[in-house]
């Protein structure tokens, strides 16, 4: 009999693969699962829930960082700062709705001038001004 674990003799041991790698994700599925278990959100956590949640978090992070990178490039900067995150989120309708109540430190405000404060455009002088 061969020693060790059962199976075919001479077969190479398969290297373990993380759940993140199996799902094709960069964010850690195991850590999200641990946080879900320790967070007292439910008594039991299914095996697919942390994978799905991790995929959603990774997608949101990629979306925000892409828009913030575009904002940084528009401002001729190579580093993303909180101002670029603020501009990216507030100029996107869906992200603004999702993060509407979120305050970003050092984010500033969107440039906006109310219509009532803008100077009135006069196409031609009125009859009272001609006399």
Swiss-Prot record:
SMART domains linked: H2A
A family per Pfam: Histone_H2A_C
Gene3D superfamilies: Histone, subunit A
Sorted UniProt keywords: Acetylation, Chromosome, DNA damage, DNA repair, DNA-binding, Methylation, Nucleosome core, Nucleus, Phosphoprotein
GO biological process, one term: DNA repair
Site location (Not ubiquitinated): 120
InterPro entries: Histone-fold, Histone_H2A, Histone_H2A/H2B/H3, Histone_H2A_C, Histone_H2A_CS
GO molecular function: DNA binding; protein heterodimerization activity; structural constituent of chromatin
N6-acetyllysine PTM sites in chain numbering: 5, 8
Subcellular location(s) per record: Nucleus; Chromosome
CDD domains: HFD_H2A
Coiled coil: none
Modified how: Phosphorylated to form H2AS128ph (gamma-H2A) in response to DNA double-strand breaks (DSBs) generated by exogenous genotoxic agents and by stalled replication forks. Phosphorylation is dependent on the DNA damage checkpoint kinases MEC1/ATR and TEL1/ATM, spreads on either side of a detected DSB site and may mark the surrounding chromatin for recruitment of proteins required for DNA damage signaling and repair. Acetylated by ESA1 to form H2AK4ac and H2AK7ac.
Residues with PTM N5-methylglutamine: 106
Cellular component, GO, one term: extracellular region
Segments carrying motif [ST]-Q motif: 128-129
N-acetylserine carried by residues: 2
PANTHER family linked to this entry: HISTONE H2A (PTHR23430)
Other remarks in the entry: In contrast to vertebrates and insects, its C-terminus is not monoubiquitinated.
Quaternary structure and interacting proteins, as annotated: The nucleosome is a histone octamer containing two molecules each of H2A, H2B, H3 and H4 assembled in one H3-H4 heterotetramer and two H2A-H2B heterodimers. The octamer wraps approximately 147 bp of DNA.
Role played: Core component of nucleosome which plays a central role in DNA double strand break (DSB) repair. Nucleosomes wrap and compact DNA into chromatin, limiting DNA accessibility to the cellular machineries which require DNA as a template. Histones thereby play a central role in transcription regulation, DNA repair, DNA replication and chromosomal stability. DNA accessibility is regulated via a complex set of post-translational modifications of histones, also called histone code, and nucleosome remodeling.
Family, similarity comment: Belongs to the histone H2A family.
Domain remarks in the Swiss-Prot or TrEMBL record: The [ST]-Q motif constitutes a recognition sequence for kinases from the PI3/PI4-kinase family.
Name of the protein described by the UniProt record: Histone H2A.1
